[in-house]
């Protein structure tokens, strides 16, 4: 069983809730805030994340990519302590996202996210892309960027994502489809 919880209640750049149907078609349960996909801008959490975290299976929590989004996760840090050895906390970077503009900026954001979430990141996921404009060169540039962030933060790179039709070589490349609307 795979459950995705949308805790990204601050930044609407990628809205997990937009993909409710797609998750369901693939057997993934999506738990989202009460007002997700409405015109109301109310950061309200209407589910028991502590209980959900003890369910069988895998739990993925989307908290967004900045320290503001990590605040919501910080509320649950104490409840997650008993599971700390089982938690992978991925710092997802995208060389082409405005917050990841440079190695220094991207590396400096990590301690802020960790402070707000009251948790420590365990690895980097390199998701450098330009959407449908992504090329093999884009991915290669992202790999170099992620390697520099890895050196600066001391975190290992867990994987690099790439679209299936982009041929790129490297360690731990995960080919995935683009579902962004």
Question: Where do the protein language model's features map onto the residues?
Answer:
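N-terminal phosphate/diphosphate-binding loop that engages ATP/GTP or pyrophosphate donors
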Residues: 1-43
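Generic beta-sheet signal
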Residues: 2, 57-61, 87-89
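Active-site flanking residues adjacent to catalytic metal/cofactor-binding acidic residues
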Residues: 5-7, 61, 93
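Active-site regions of enzymes building and remodeling cell-envelope glycoconjugates
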Residues: 27, 169-181
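Switch II (G3) loop of P-loop NTPases
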Residues: 32-38, 57-72
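A short, well-structured juxtamembrane/interface segment
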Residues: 43-50
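Catalytic phosphate/metal-binding cores of nucleic-acid and nucleotide-processing enzymes, i.e., regions
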Residues: 54
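Conserved catalytic-core segment of NTP-binding enzymes
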Residues: 67-170, 174
């Amino acid at each position: 069983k795979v459950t995705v919880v949308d805790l990204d209640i601050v930044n609407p750049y990628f809205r997990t809730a937009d993909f409710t149907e797609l998750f369901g078609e693939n057997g993934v349960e999506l738990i989202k805030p009460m007002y997700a996909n409405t015109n109301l801008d109310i950061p309200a959490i209407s589910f028991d994340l502590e209980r959900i975290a003890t369910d069988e299976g895998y739990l993925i929590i989307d908290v967004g990519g900045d320290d503001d989004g990590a605040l919501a996760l910080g509320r649950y840090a104490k409840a997650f302590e008993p599971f700390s050895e089982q938690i992978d906390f991925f710092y997802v970077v995208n060389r082409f996202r405005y917050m990841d503009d440079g190695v220094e900026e991207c590396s400096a954001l990590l301690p802020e996210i960790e402070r707000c979430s009251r948790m420590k990141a365990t690895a980097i996921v390199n998701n450098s892309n330009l959407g449908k404009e992504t090329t093999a060169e884009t991915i290669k540039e992202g790999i170099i960027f992620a390697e520099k962030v890895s050196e600066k933060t001391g975190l290992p790179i867990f994987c690099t994502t790439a679209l299936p039709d982009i041929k790129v070589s490297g360690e731990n490349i995960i080919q995935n489809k683009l579902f962004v609307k």
